[in-house]
Amino acid sequence: MMIKIYDTMTRSLREFVPITDKVVNMYVCGPTVYNYIHIGNARSAVAFDTVRRYFEYAGYTVNYISNFTDVDDKIIKAAKEAGLSPKQLADQFIAAFMEDTKALGVKPATKNPRVMDYMDEIIAFIAALIKKGYAYESAGDVYFRVAKASNYARLANKTIADLEAGASGRTDTETALKENPLDFALWKSAKPGEVSWTSPWSAGRPGWHIECSVMATELLGDTIDIHGGGADLEFPHHTNEIAQSEAKTSKTFANYWMHNGFVNVDNEKMSKSLGNFVTVHDLLKTVDGQTLRFFLATQHYRKPINFTEKAIHDAEVNLKYLKNTLQQPTVATADSSQLAAFVTAFKAAMNDDFNTANGITVLFDMAKWINSGAYSEAVKSAFEEMLAVFGIVFEAESLDTEIEQLIAERQEARANRDFAKADAIRDQLAAQGIKLLDTKDGVRWIRD
């Protein structure tokens, strides 16, 4: 079975064909590190971590690059307010990002490049665009000539004519420096007192879009397999990445474009003005990281997902059920054909554009089968591997000696028809969170 990906560029489901056999080169836009990440950022991190994990489950080697934007107007403003340097502020929130995403079970990226570490490469990239006629200097700034780009904004299903109609009438200071209102900044001269780097055009800093183009091509080559990010990045960020990257290299920048949907809070768009802005840092004080991750997996990555207290509660209950399933004692054998059918169904769900919602349905069908007494070592291994695709890994919990002894004593009491003692032991175990299940095959237990 082939993995199929919904490609934003073509607006179609396409079979995934890597540039190099069994290798996936992925670049996913990471956060601008001026604050704690919000749940929308978390959805992107979790969605593409799941994509990465499924590729690895399917036998691929994944080079996963996700950047930190540590040079940005928002960082400069926040650093000034906090009395820190931009680097100090960025370091603080990069550390917070790593801590928060670790709690969500997000695997470390192959590399997390930082803009500050690629300044020489960014300047060289811009110089190459100027040399080819795709960019120009104006009063110390450098802008990209949108009119010269081939099929500009095709990713966002827009045309230059559409965009020009929307840009007509602009009269701000920056627009006055441009040949065309649609042209976007590759380099911006610094204001007095702002952090800056020396360049042939001015002491300044790069524009947002050029940063990702440079880091992606430096680390993964001129053409990458998959470029991902939130749906809000489709235009202008990813649109402009394509324009400048393909102008420089004359090659396709990315073969597949993937975008995750938004997170709403109680059916409303999350925003600071509505007072429903939820950071992961605060959320993790009351919600377990695995529960939050499992909630984010319950909806297909391209669709919007609604964050509510009930949805989090449901995720918590469902995770507990899966955990209890994993804690069943194993049996010698189970129906291998039924196991194969579950594995096939799971792959079919995930091969269909990483449909986690359908994949989770398979997991619960399999859990029901396991709880009927079909928990062999082979079944256990397959079930754990599927859970790991969703970043769900439970710590091994063994039945300790005391509980084992109590269960044995209860069995002996039942054999001697001392039902009062047997019931007392059951109550004692229940107080410790151990639930006993009397089945035709003997006693089975779960942590309740």
Curated annotation (Swiss-Prot):
ATP binds at residue 272. It is found in: Cytoplasm. Its cofactor is Zn(2+). Zn(2+) binds at residues 29, 212, 237, 241. CDD domains: CysRS_core. One of its GO terms (biological process) is cysteinyl-tRNA aminoacylation. It holds the Pfam family tRNA-synt_1e. Keywords: Aminoacyl-tRNA synthetase, ATP-binding, Cytoplasm, Ligase, Metal-binding, Nucleotide-binding, Protein biosynthesis, Zinc. NCBIfam families: cysS. Belongs to the class-I aminoacyl-tRNA synthetase family. This is Cysteine--tRNA ligase. It comes from Streptococcus equi subsp. zooepidemicus (strain MGCS10565). The gene is cysS.
